[in-house]
Amino acid sequence: MKLTCVLIISVLFLTASQLITAVYSRDKQQYRAARLRDEMRNLKGARDCGEQGQGCYTRPCCPGLECRGGGTGGGVCQQ
């Protein structure tokens, strides 16, 4: 009888702690995903246009910049 009570209380305690942990980590994962998404957007290789001083041989320059010096190696984005 005592062993059964201890077992039931242990199972209830473990279940409650798992539920609390799952709810807590679900909120953390949501913020983590948003942070990773923002970091991916800020990577230089992930941008669709070349910034000032970057090459414009394979991709266009960002707005306000022009591709200049288009020799054999391609141009450079400049104002």
UniProtKB/Swiss-Prot annotation:
The presence of a 'disulfide through disulfide knot' structurally defines this protein as a knottin. Residues 23-47 form a propeptide. One of its GO terms (molecular function) is ion channel inhibitor activity. Keywords: Disulfide bond, Hydroxylation, Ion channel impairing toxin, Knottin, Secreted, Signal, Toxin. Expressed by the venom duct. Belongs to the conotoxin O1 superfamily. InterPro entries: Conotoxin. The keyword Cell inner membrane does not apply. The modification 4-hydroxyproline is found at residues 60, 63. It comes from Conus terebra (Sea snail). One of its GO terms (cellular component) is extracellular region. This is Conotoxin Tr6.2. It is found in: Secreted. It comes from the Eukaryota. It holds the Pfam family Conotoxin. Ion channel inhibitor that inhibits the increase in intracellular calcium upon depolarization in DRG neurons. In vivo, both intraperitoneal and intracranial injections into mice induce hyperactivity.
